[in-house]
């Protein structure tokens, strides 16, 4: 899981 932060 990769979140756009």
UniProtKB/Swiss-Prot annotation:
A Gene Ontology BP annotation from the UniProt entry: defense response
Q: Report the domain of life of the source organism.
A: Eukaryota
Sequence positions bearing Methionine amide: 5
Cellular location of this protein? Secreted
Tissue-level expression reads: Expressed by the skin glands.
What is the predominant subcellular site recorded for this chain?
secreted
Report the GO terms under cellular component: extracellular region
Instruction: For this UniProt record, give its keywords in alphabetical order, as a comma-separated list.
Output: Amidation, Amphibian defense peptide, Secreted
- List the protein's name: Electrin-3
Native species: Litoria rubella (Desert tree frog)
